Each structure stands twice: as structure tokens, then as C-alpha cells.
Amino acid sequence: ADWRRREPGRHARSAFRAAAAAGTLTLIAGFWLLTPGAERLRDFKPSEFKFLSQIQSFPDTRVVATSTDIRGRVDRVESPHLRFAPGLSLKHTEPLPPTTVVLTDGDRPVFLYDRHSAAEVLFARDTLSYAGYELVDRPGSVLILLSGGGLAVPCAIASGADRIRILHANPQVADLIRTHYGLPVTAGNPRSYLTQS
């Protein structure tokens, strides 16, 4: 019966040692992942079915910037072959402006349209997305809840709105949009933003 009696606190000490060993191993693995030797493990090659893999098959397409955080990998891709204008009228005959695409984890494209002149975004007036702006003469302010696509931004610019604010959930993508368009962009959850404003 003596073997059943255990030393008080022995179980707690064993659990503490096990937790300390696991924590130490986790820290060592984490630091190792930051070394140049582990770069192959950190960099992933996207699946052939991802948008990033598909557009990289176009000539003169290049990934110009890549960043990674807890929300995923964000790539900015430039190509002379990228065009995005869903719902474009068949009557539109002018060439579309060049675009840059921002991809999260190789998918979820957000297209950023060239904006060297106001005329370059006027193509948006010939899209179905612009129909709402036809109902209002010139909107005072526009809030764009942007999760993908990106056509909403040139539509708002083409409408001549006085104030345009863009909201995107991913801070990395929000920074790229802000830098590209020079418009106010907020990173965050749309519901939280709307309840606070």
C-alpha cells in the first residue's frame, strides 16, 4: 500500500517539466524557422489551380512584391496582359487601362487600375457596376467595402464623388490600395467599422 502513496507535488513538478521542455522545443523550432536554412520551408509554391500560378504563365508577368504575416501571403503582380472589367458594355471600344493585381494566398484578386489621368478610369462608366451611380447626380461620399475584384474603385472615381473611403479586411492589402490610389483606406472588419461610424 506504500507504493500508492505519492509524494505531494510530484505530479505538478512532472507536468511543469514537460511543459517547460515542450515550450523550449517550440522556441528552438521557431527560431530555426527564421534562419536562412529554413527558407525552403517558409516559401510555398502555390497550387497550379491558384490564380497566381495561372497568370505567371503569361509572358512578361512578374511578382513585384511579396509579404507574409499571420493573415497569409500577399503578392503584387504586374503584367501587360491583365485586364478586369466584368459587365463591360459591348459598345465600349477603347482599350482598358493596365492593371496590377494583389493576391492573397495566390487567390482572391484585387485589381488596381492605372490612374495616371482621370480619363483612364472612365471605362468604368460602361460597366454594370456603375449603374448605381447613374441614379445619383454626383455622390458626396462613397464607402467601398472591398473584398475582391476592385472595379468599385474606378466606378467611384469616375462618378466624381467628393469623398471616397475604401475598407479592406487585410491590412497588407489595404496599404497597397492606399499607396496605389492615394485614397483613404481603412483596414478592418466592415461590421465593426460600420457600427463605430
Regions found by a protein language model. Give the residues of each.
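Conserved SAM/SAH-binding loop
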Residues: 187-197
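Membrane-embedded alpha-helical segments of integral membrane proteins
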Residues: 1-6
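Membrane-interfacial entry segments at the cytosolic side of transmembrane helices
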Residues: 7-24
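Class I S-adenosylmethionine
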Residues: 24-161, 167-188
